[in-house]
């Protein structure tokens, strides 16, 4: 359809046959409500042709119409391929989008492709403890991390427990000096480029460290106090609270918190009503190595071990040696590791890879990128990016179709084209580990996709990684259609207006594809 505009209130239309791709682009990219109101009658007029010339809407037309119901301004990219690799839908296939947590697909695929023995216990990643003697005094205790994401200090811990290391120290000595958390296995890069500063105080932006404990989070509970007074806050003494919140007579609970980077004072604001249920909060940790030392001192004291010194952290500053470009591809130097008094053996990495994709655990994903980085590099983000690029080159993904700055998708610098994502997904399906990787994805009707596909035609028939970030929604994976076909797809929505979501339109589009195949 071509339209020529004359007077402001008249529309002179000359009808021609328009390629489907142009019509679908109009349907998807016409976001302004005013333009939509102008274009919609034209699309209807375009169908007012003799009966013999009418054509049924194509699948792309149907999907484009669904996506056009998303909030105005949303930009979509979608690629769907059949079993042979033929693209049956292609909308902005090579445009680059912020992928949000779809980034985790690329991180976990690299881990499957490069790490050996992921279905076996993981002694290489286990946390260790050693005693360091400096002169004739009591030895210092050093807890050394090697990138394990699942170390726990919970009272009910059964595997990978910090308490086991405290038992080993208590069996060796009853007096120690300083307690030091050592995360120098990786260089000190606690946040990736492009991390939003406002996320840092939260669990979503907690620091990344080779020595990680309890997901690098600290919980607190806020309970209503007397009317007009600050609420009560139950919080371990790692942080102190600047309590500016108020107990009110009624209304919904609205509690917010903030904290300066590397500070230990949390500012609490907002309101909680009399009789309201307690409000749980989760705080991020900026220095996980120090946090682990703090917690380890408590465990030692509970075992009767006297600590005469202080708690501290030992970091390895980022240096030129952590940049593979400066090393010109040479492996990173590996200084000899000190002997440990005791070392834990975490559960198989496949369990953590499942957590990363199904739960979308940011910290674990960024630690996995660094684990991959240590194979030939230093544990730096840059070395991890080299590993991801090498995997994508093997998968046949064009270099122009991606850029990554972290392993989790929290960075706003990440970019992926839908065609690149589908190319990787199809390659994964051909790998010996492809079925195991697919099993780590959320499943329709369960977990993160329970509310989105439960009770639909794709209930337990879609296996896909979700993604949500500011102004971004994403979903990529595999679906089993009404006709029993297995399709590979990737759909991104960017520039979603604040306070809205494109998820509903995306899910209807995916269901439309499944119903038509």
Cite the ranges covered by each PLM segment.
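Bacterial N-terminal signal peptides that target proteins for export
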Residues: 15, 22, 26-40
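Bacterial N-terminal signal peptides
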Residues: 39-48
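Sec/Tat signal peptide C-region and signal peptidase I cleavage site
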Residues: 49-53
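Conserved serine DD-peptidase/penicillin-binding transpeptidase domain
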Residues: 54-66, 113-399, 482, 505, ...
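A short, well-structured edge-of-sheet supersecondary motif
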Residues: 68-91, 312
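Short active-site loop at a secondary-structure junction
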Residues: 90-110
């Amino acid at each position: 359809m071509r339209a020529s505009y004359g007077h402001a209130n008249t529309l002179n239309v000359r009808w021609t046959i328009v390629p489907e791709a142009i019509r679908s682009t109009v349907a998807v990219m016409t976001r302004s409500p005013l333009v939509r109101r102008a274009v919609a009658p034209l699309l209807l007029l375009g169908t007012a042709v003799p009966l013999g010339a009418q054509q049924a809407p194509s699948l792309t037309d149907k999907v484009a119409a669904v996506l056009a119901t998303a909030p105005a301004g949303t930009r979509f990219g979608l690629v769907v391929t059949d079993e042979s690799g033929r693209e049956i839908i292609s909308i902005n296939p090579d445009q680059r989008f912020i992928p949000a947590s779809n980034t985790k697909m690329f991180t976990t695929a690299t881990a499957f492709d490069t790490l050996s023995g992921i279905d076996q216990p993981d002694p290489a990643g286990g946390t260790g403890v050693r005693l360091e003697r400096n002169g004739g005094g009591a030895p210092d205790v050093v807890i050394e991390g090697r990138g394990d994401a699942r170390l726990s200090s919970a009272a009910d811990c059964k595997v990978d427990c910090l308490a086991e290391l405290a038992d080993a120290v208590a069996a060796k000595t009853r007096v120690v000096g300083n307690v030091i958390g050592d995360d120098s296995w990786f260089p000190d890069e606690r946040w990736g480029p492009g991390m939003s500063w406002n996320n840092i105080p939260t669990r979503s932006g907690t620091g990344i460290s080779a020595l990680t404990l309890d997901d690098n989070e600290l919980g607190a509970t806020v309970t209503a106090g007397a009317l007009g007074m600050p609420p009560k806050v139950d919080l371990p003494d790692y942080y102190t609270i600047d309590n500016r919140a108020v107990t009110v007579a009624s209304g919904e609970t609205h509690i917010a918190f903030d904290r300066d980077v590397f500070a230990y004072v949390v500012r609490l604001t907002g309101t909680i009503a009399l009789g309201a249920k307690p409000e749980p909060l989760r705080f991020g940790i900026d220095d996980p190595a120090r946090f682990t030392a703090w917690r380890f001192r408590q465990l030692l004291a509970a075992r009767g071990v006297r600590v005469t010194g202080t708690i501290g952290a030992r970091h390895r500053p980022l240096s030129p040696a952590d940049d593979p470009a400066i090393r010109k591809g040479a492996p990173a130097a590996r200084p000899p590791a000190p002997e440990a008094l005791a070392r834990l053996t975490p559960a198989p990495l496949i369990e953590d890879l499942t957590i990363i994709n199904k739960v979308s655990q940011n910290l674990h994903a960024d630690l996995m990128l660094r684990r991959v980085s240590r194979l030939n590099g230093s544990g730096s983000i840059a070395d991890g990016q080299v590993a991801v690029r090498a995997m994508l080159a093997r998968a046949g993904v064009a270099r122009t179709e991606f850029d990554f700055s972290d392993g989790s998708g929290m960075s706003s610098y990440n970019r992926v084209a839908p065609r690149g994502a589908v190319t990787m997904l199809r390659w994964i399906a051909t790998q010996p580990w492809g079925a195991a990787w697919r099993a780590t994805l959320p499943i329709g009707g369960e977990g993160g996709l329970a509310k989105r596909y439960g009770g639909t035609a794709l209930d337990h028939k879609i296996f896909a990684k979700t993604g949500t970030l500011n102004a971004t929604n994403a979903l990529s994976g595999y679906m089993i259609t009404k006709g029993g076909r297995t399709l590979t797809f990737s759909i991104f929505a960017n520039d979603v207006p604040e306070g809205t979501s494109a998820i509903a339109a995306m899910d209807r589009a995916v269901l439309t594809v499944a119903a038509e195949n």
